[in-house]
């Protein structure tokens, strides 16, 4: 039976070629036989021993929820039966809220009557403070100047955001120059404070060997010796003056 199953496809192919008038030579019979047998034994499905990496179910909890198709949420939501407030369209019935003209939030804007500055106003600014000028300032002056710079940078950022939102198309270059000027002033303030900190550290090392300075915390921190000696001499002189006997008064 096995021989007949192999010969039948070969004979069928030979008969078809003979009907067509083309008889193949004898040495091509093994080729015809192998092609016919392999075609009948071809594997139709793929085979793999590796495990699949696909999950048996979808882990997306929002699968099927779409705002464009208005499918709604997959779980019920709690909605109250309260009525929504209606807007007051009549301006005469609206409440007039009084706003403080000197409110602190106005400090974030350069102008109260307009949102953006003109290019001329944005470009009109002075030069930054130098470290030489700031070395003679007090701690309070440096602290105030630092927060003025912070407020100015906040104003610049607010106007830059507003220009980007409105697509004004101007003022970006002037705002960058103005911001760089403020940043240079802040850099000079940091330099002066760093110099003062290093000077304080060096003075603390020198003060440890100074007899007039006491770091123990039990008494005053600074006690000048010359003033103490002069004070002791004055006290002794006053005590000696009080101890001298007074001359006797002669009465008639």
Curated annotation (Swiss-Prot):
Residues 233-252 are annotated as: Disordered. It is found in: Mitochondrion. One of its GO terms (cellular component) is mitochondrial large ribosomal subunit. Residues 1-39 form a transit peptide. Disulfide bonds: none annotated. Pfam families: MRP-L47. GO terms for biological process: mitochondrial translation. One of its GO terms (molecular function) is structural constituent of ribosome. It comes from the Eukaryota. Keywords: Mitochondrion, Ribonucleoprotein, Ribosomal protein, Transit peptide. Belongs to the universal ribosomal protein uL29 family. Component of the mitochondrial large ribosomal subunit. Mature mitochondrial ribosomes consist of a small (37S) and a large (54S) subunit. The 37S subunit contains at least 33 different proteins and 1 molecule of RNA (15S). The 54S subunit contains at least 45 different proteins and 1 molecule of RNA (21S). This is Large ribosomal subunit protein uL29m. The lineage of its organism: Eukaryota, Fungi, Dikarya, Ascomycota, Pezizomycotina. The gene is mrpl4.
């Amino acid at each position: 039976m096995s021989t007949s199953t192999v010969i039948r496809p070969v004979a069928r192919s030979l008969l078809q070629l003979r009907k067509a008038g083309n008889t193949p030579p004898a040495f091509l019979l093994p080729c015809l036989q192998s092609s016919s047998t392999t075609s009948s034994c071809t594997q139709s499905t793929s085979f793999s021993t590796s495990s699949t990496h696909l999950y048996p179910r979808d882990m997306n909890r929002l699968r099927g929820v779409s705002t464009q198709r208005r499918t709604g949420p997959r779980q019920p939501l709690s909605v109250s039966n309260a009525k929504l407030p209606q807007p007051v369209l009549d301006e005469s019935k609206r409440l007039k809220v009084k706003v403080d003209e000197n409110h602190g939030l106005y400090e974030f804007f350069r102008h109260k009557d307009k949102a953006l500055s003109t290019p001329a106003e944005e470009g009109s600014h002075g030069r930054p403070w130098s470290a030489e000028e700031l070395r003679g300032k007090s701690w309070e002056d440096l602290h105030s100047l630092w927060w003025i710079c912070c407020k100015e940078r906040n104003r610049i950022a607010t106007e830059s955001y507003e220009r980007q939102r409105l697509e004004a198309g101007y003022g970006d270059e002037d705002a960058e120059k103005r911001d760089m000027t403020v940043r240079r002033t802040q850099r000079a303030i940091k330099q002066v404070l760093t110099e003062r900190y290093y000077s304080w550290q060096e003075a603390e090392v020198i003060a440890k060997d100074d007899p007039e300075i006491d770091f123990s915390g039990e008494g005053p921190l600074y006690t000048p010796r010359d003033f103490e000696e002069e004070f002791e001499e004055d006290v002794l002189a006053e005590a000696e003056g009080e101890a001298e006997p007074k001359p006797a008064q002669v009465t008639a």
